[in-house]
C-alpha cells in the first residue's frame, strides 16, 4: 500500500501524482480526494481524543488529590464516569475511521513508473525486444528446434507420449484436472530441477515455500480481487487459510516485521522459490482449455528479490535478463513486452512479460511476468531498511521484486510444440541429465483419438 503521507501535501505528499497514476491505471481518481477528506476527519477525531485524554488524566490527578486530602470527590467521580463513556465512544470512532481510511488506501495502486505505456488496451503493450535461435529464419508453424512442421498441439504430443491422462484427472478433481504419467512426470520434474539449479548457480537462495497462508498475511500481499478470482480457501473450524497462487506470496511475507539496519551489507537478497501453486482461474473460463497450459494446480520456480530502493530498477533488469537466459538455453523463441498501465496489478509499478512462441497455435503466449513492486508490499508487511536519520520525514522500506522463472507446466507446453517431430519428441539438451537414462529422444507410443484438436483443424482446412 502507499504511504498515507503521499496523499497529504502538508506532509510532503503529492496527491496529483497519485491521481495521474490512478488515471493511467483506469482506476478511480475520486478515491484520492475521498482519502484526503477521510484523513482530515480522522485527524480531527484524533485531536479530540487526545484533548479528551488530557482532560481525563488531569481529572484523575484531581481525584487523587481529593482522596489524599480526604475531601469529597463524588462530583469529580461522576464527571469521570461521564468522560469514560465519552472516551470509549470517541476511541471506537477513531479506530473505525482509521480502519476505513486504511481500507481505502489499500485500494489505490502503486505509482505507475513514467516509462510505462499509458493505455487500458493490452494490444498497446510495448514490444521491448525479441529473440530466436540464430538458425531459425522466422517464427511460424515450424517447430523452432527440430525444423519440422508443428502438426500437433502440446497436449496432443503429451497424449502420444503417454505423458498425461486428462480424462481420469477430470474424473477425480473436475475441470482442468490431469495426471502426469511416465515421461510427463520426468519432463516436468526436469524443468523444476533445472530451474532451481540455474538460479542457485547465480547466487539465489533456494526456498521451498509453504502452500498455505493465514488470512492476515495473505491480505497484506494479495489484492482484494485475487481473493475472488484466484485463491482457494481452506477452513478448519475457525482457522481460515488460503492456498497460495504463487510462492511470491509467502516469500514476500518471509521477512515481515523485520528491519535490515545495515542494508549495504545485508541487501540485496535473492531467493529462488519453489512450490506447488493453486489458482481458481474464475475469470478465465474457457480460456486456454487445452492440456496443462492453464490449470488449477501447477509447479512454479519464482525469483524474489529484496533490495535497497536505490538499486531496485537495476535488479528489475537483471531479473528479466535471467529469465531470458533460461529460455535461450531451452532455445525457445520469445519476445519481451512492457505491460500497459491499465493492465498492471495494484502492487506493480512496472511489469515485463516474456511471451514464448507456440508454433502450432501460431502465437506468443505468456510464460514469465517480472514486476517491480517498489515499497508497495514492504510497507504493508513492515519490512524496513536503514536507520532513520534526524530530519527524515518517512521510514525507509525495502523494495520487493518478483519474476517467474518457469511455471513448469506452461514452459513444458512450449517445449513440446517446439521440439516435436513426426515420430516423437527431441529432449532439450539442458534437461536430459535430470531424466532417467538421459534420453535424447522420446518416441510416440499412442495414437490420437479421431476427434483430436489437430484432426479437427485438418477437417476445417479441407
Curated annotation (Swiss-Prot):
Residues that coordinate or bind ATP: 279-281, 295, 366-369
Keyword hit for Cytoplasm: yes
Q: What is its main location?
A: cytoplasm
Q: Which residues carry this modification: Cysteine persulfide?
A: 373, 400
InterPro entries listed in its UniProt record: aa-tRNA-synt_IIb, aa-tRNA-synth_II, aa-tRNA-synth_II/BPL/LPL, Ser-tRNA-ligase_type_1, Ser-tRNA-synth_1_N, SerRS_1_N_sf, SerRS_core, tRNA-bd_arm
Q: Where does L-serine bind?
A: 246-248, 302, 404
Query: GO cellular component terms?
Result: cytoplasm; cytoplasmic stress granule; cytosol
A GO BP entry is: positive regulation of tRNA methylation
Q: Could you tell me the EC number(s) of this protein?
A: 6.1.1.11
Domain of life assignment: Eukaryota
Catalysed reaction, written as an equation? tRNA(Ser) + L-serine + ATP = L-seryl-tRNA(Ser) + AMP + diphosphate + H(+)
Posttranslational mods? Conjugated to URM1, a ubiquitin-like protein, in response to oxidative stresses. The attachment of URM1 to lysine residues exclusively depends on the presence of a peroxidatic cysteine in the target protein, with low specificity for the particular residue, motif, or structural context at which urmylation can occur. The URM1-conjugation reaction is mechanistically and directly coupled to the process of cysteine persulfidation, transfering the sulfur atom of the URM1 thiocarboxyl group to redox-active cysteine residues in the target protein if it is exposed to oxidative conditions. Persulfidated on specific redox-active cysteine residues. Persulfidation (also called protein S-sulfhydration) may provide a molecular mechanism that enables cells to protect vulnerable cysteine residues from reactive oxygen species (ROS) under stress conditions.
Write out the annotated subcellular location: Cytoplasm, Cytosol
Q: What is known of its domains?
A: Consists of two distinct domains, a catalytic core and a N-terminal extension that is involved in tRNA binding.
Q: What does the UniProt function comment say about this protein?
A: Catalyzes the attachment of serine to tRNA(Ser) in a two-step reaction: serine is first activated by ATP to form Ser-AMP and then transferred to the acceptor end of tRNA(Ser).
Subunit structure of this chain's protein: Homodimer; the tRNA molecule probably binds across the dimer. Interacts with ABP140; interaction is required for the tRNA N(3)-methylcytidine methyltransferase activity of ABP140.
PANTHER family assigned to the protein according to its UniProt record, in alphabetical order: SERYL-TRNA SYNTHETASE
Q: What is this protein called?
A: Serine--tRNA ligase, cytoplasmic
Amino acid at each position: 500500500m502507499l504511504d498515507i503521507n503521499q496523499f497529504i501535501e502538508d506532509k510532503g505528499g503529492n496527491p496529483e501524482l497519485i491521481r495521474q497514476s490512478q488515471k493511467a491505471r483506469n482506476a478511480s481518481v475520486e478515491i484520492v480526494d475521498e482519502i484526503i477528506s477521510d484523513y482530515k476527519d480522522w485527524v480531527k477525531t484524533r485531536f479530540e481524543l487526545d484533548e479528551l485524554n488530557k482532560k481525563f488524566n488531569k481529572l484523575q490527578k484531581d481525584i487523587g488529590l481529593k482522596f489524599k486530602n480526604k475531601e469529597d470527590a463524588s462530583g469529580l467521580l461522576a464527571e469521570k464516569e461521564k468522560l469514560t463513556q465519552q472516551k470509549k465512544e470517541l476511541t471506537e470512532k477513531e479506530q473505525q475511521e482509521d480502519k476505513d481510511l486504511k481500507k481505502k488506501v489499500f485500494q489505490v495502486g502503486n505509482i505507475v513508473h513514467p516509462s510505462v505505456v499509458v493505455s487500458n488496451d493490452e494490444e498497446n503493450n510495448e514490444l521491448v525486444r525479441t529473440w530466436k535461435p540464430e538458425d531459425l529464419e522466422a517464427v511460424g508453424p515450424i517447430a523452432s528446434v527440430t525444423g519440422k512442421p508443428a502438426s500437433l498441439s502440446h497436449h496432443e504430443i503429451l497424449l502420444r507420449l503417454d505423458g498425461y491422462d486428462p480424462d481420469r484427472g477430470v474424473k477425480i478433481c473436475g475441470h482442468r484436472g490431469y495426471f502426469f504419467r511416465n515421461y510427463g512426470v520426468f519432463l516436468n520434474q526436469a524443468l523444476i530441477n533445472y530451474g532451481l539449479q540455474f538460479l542457485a548457480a547465480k547466487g539465489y537462495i533456494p526456498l521451498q515455500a509453504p502452500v498455505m497462508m493465514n488470512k492476515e498475511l495473505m491480505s497484506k500481499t494479495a489484492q482484494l480481487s485475487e481473493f475472488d478470482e484466484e485463491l482457494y480457501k481452506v477452513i478448519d473450524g475457525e482457522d481460515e487459510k488460503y492456498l497460495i497462487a504463487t510462492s511470491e506470496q509467502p516469500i514476500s511475507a518471509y521477512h515481515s516485521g523485520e528491519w535490515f539496519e545495515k542494508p549495504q551489507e545485508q541487501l540485496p537478497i535473492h531467493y529462488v522459490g519453489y512450490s506447488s501453486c493453486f489458482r481458481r482461474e474464475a475469470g478465465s473460463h474457457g480460456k486456454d482449455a487445452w492440456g496443462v497450459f492453464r490449470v488449477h494446480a501447477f509447479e512454479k520456480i519464482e525469483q524474489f528479490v529484496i533490495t535497497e530502493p536505490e538499486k531496485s530498477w537495476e535488479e528489475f533488469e537483471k531479473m528479466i535478463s535471467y529469465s531470458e537466459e533460461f529460455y535461450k538455453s531451452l532455445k525457445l523463441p520469445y519476445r519481451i513486452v512492457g505491460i500497459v498501465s491499465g493492465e498492471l496489478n495494484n502492487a506493480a509499478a512496472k511489469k515485463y512479460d516474456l511471451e514464448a512462441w507456440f508454433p502450432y497455435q501460431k502465437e506468443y503466449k505468456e510464460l514469465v511476468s517480472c514486476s517491480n513492486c517498489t515499497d508497495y508490499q514492504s510497507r504493508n508487511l513492515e519490512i524496513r531498511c536503514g536507520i532513520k536519520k534526524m530530519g527524515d520525514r518517512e521510514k525507509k522500506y525495502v523494495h520487493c521484486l518478483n519474476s517467474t522463472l518457469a511455471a513448469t507446466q506452461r514452459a513444458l507446453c512450449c517445449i513440446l510444440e517446439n521440439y516435436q517431430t513426426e515420430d516423437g519428441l527431441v529432449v532439450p539438451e539442458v534437461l536430459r541429465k535430470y531424466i532417467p537414462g538421459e534420453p535424447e529422444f522420446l518416441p510416440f507410443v499412442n495414437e490420437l483419438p479421431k476427434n483430436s484438436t489437430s484432426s479437427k483443424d485438418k477437417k476445417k482446412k479441407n
